[in-house]
């Protein structure tokens, strides 16, 4: 029997985006991935935008994703620690996954130390220079007032409007020229500034949809997890180092 000692990191599944068939295919792929890692995973970090939209009403959650959630429950029941990070598409997670899966919900950053290595973990949205309009919107969307007002809307209307907004937001972002990976990558800028006052071996993010492994200095590396719409990339810490991998590619 394999020893469960590895940390797995993945983000930006965007379950629910595209057609029902494409989202279901992505979900089935994720279930196969979770089956694969179950043998040696100690902890699984799902680092934001797991869903293309998510809102927890008091007694209602979005339909679908039952195979994915069932597999997560299986991992949790087997003693594997689950972490859910809020992303910009699924920031309205509250306590459902804590109650049903025993997961820990992370709203912003998480700092951990494992096997003598220090990690800084964050979905990646709203960090670094620029993007001031999104940072303004994020403050509004995360406010208790905004969440309370949205909860007053019937799910048939509220979820429909939110899904439209999510699709529109993605089209706008895809139409923008992306920055080239390297020193000008905005999360690299954020990491460089952070490392002036703190030390981390690994700074791991999602959000950018770019699988990246960039050396920041002699001891620190920036890892971006990519996404699962096309790349199906993820990272693994085996107790010594972090590596990027691609599932079924």
Each predicted region: which residue ranges?
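Active-site-proximal beta-strand elements of phosphoester/diester hydrolases
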Residues: 6-14, 118-125, 222-226
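Core catalytic region of metal-dependent phosphoesterases/phosphodiesterases
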Residues: 2-6, 10, 15-114
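Active-site environment of divalent metal-dependent phosphoester hydrolases
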Residues: 16-18, 52-55, 85-95, 127-129, ...
